[in-house]
A protein has these predicted regions:
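C-terminal beta-signal and adjacent terminal beta-strands/loops
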Residues: 228-299
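Surface-exposed extracellular loop regions of Gram-negative outer-membrane beta-barrel proteins
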Residues: 1-36, 156-160, 181-206
């Protein structure tokens, strides 16, 4: 059992606004049970958790996107509460998870007419809380064997939701098409500290919150990494990757809300070089960890 208390004061140009201020005191119970069944490890757990909005999403500051679109935060945004019941099953390099969640006040991006504008084409995008709570069921399976220098990773998951969203005509739509992902990643250890990475992922049509995917997507990347020893200075890792080499990651969808938007993103072949310098890997100096990590992450 965990208790959290958080108090936030909100000022608008120096004026204290009681309606936007927050004072939360919440209990977060957890319970878990685990047991072996032969060579299979089973666990069942329940927990209640909270996800507070990022501070940027609580700002009333408005950003210009283009002549028809503005974006802002929402100081009235409330945190999201999640009740989760998780069954996990593990056997050697295989893992299966079944996760049922009841989600309250989930945040979503809403597109609305811009207040004060006569042009009906001008829109304001801002985060809001969903009007209706919804259920979510996640089924996930992962296989991670080791075959010599080859480290394959197969994963598949499907998510079922009964998410409700308002429509432009004033009606309500239930977005309950399953959202799925099938991925195959390969890491191959090569001589002289070289590594080769290959990944392919298929995303079929489906619904994720208020976004309906109307076109299947195929993602892939190929990469090569090299570890370089810098002796007393640590080590340097060079990671060169090509994302979407076949330019197949085209996605299309519909964003439901007070205003409905059609989204189309073309495929783009992208190259990325990442250099990572690691030093003090032995952690000889105490770096500590604070109790405010979640609050810092919200920034």
């Amino acid at each position: 059992m965990r208790y959290e208390h958080l108090k936030t004061d909100y000022y608008n140009f120096g004026t204290h606004e009681d309606e936007v201020c927050r004072d939360y005191g919440d209990w977060f119970p957890t319970a878990s049970l685990s047991m072996p069944l032969g060579n299979v490890q089973l666990s069942l757990s329940y927990r209640r958790d909270i996800e507070r909005p990022n501070y940027s999403n609580l700002s009333s500051y408005t950003v210009y996107i283009n002549r028809y679109t503005y974006q802002s935060g929402n100081p009235y945004l409330k945190p999201m509460y999640i009740h989760s019941l998780v069954l996990n099953c593990a056997y050697k390099w295989m893992n299966m998870t079944v996760n049922y969640s009841r989600i309250n006040d989930a945040p979503t991006m809403s597109t609305e007419p811009y207040p004060g504008y006569d042009d009906p084409l001008v829109s304001l995008i801002r985060p809001i809380n969903t009007r209706d709570d919804y259920n979510q069921l996640l089924l996930h399976i992962a296989l991670r064997p080791v075959i010599g220098c080859w480290h394959p990773y197969w994963s598949a998951y499907v998510i079922f939701r009964d998410y409700k969203s308002p429509c432009a005509d004033g009606s309500t739509i239930t977005l309950n098409h399953p959202y799925a992902s099938f991925a195959w990643q390969n890491d191959i250890e090569l001589p002289r500290h070289w590594r080769l990475s290959l990944m392919a992922q298929w995303l079929p049509k489906g619904d994720t919150n208020n976004f309906r995917i109307t076109r299947s997507v195929f993602n892939s990347f190929v990469g090569v990494q090299r570890d370089i020893s810098l002796r007393s200075l640590g080590s340097l890792t060079a990671d060169l990757r090509c994302y979407d080499p076949f330019e197949t990651a085209k996605d299309e969808g519909i964003i439901f809300g007070i205003r409905e938007l059609t989204s189309k993103n073309p495929a783009r072949r992208t190259f990325m070089l990442n250099l990572t310098w690691k030093f003090n890997e032995a952690r000889s100096k105490y770096r500590g960890s604070g109790a405010g990590e979640k609050q810092k992450a919200r920034m």
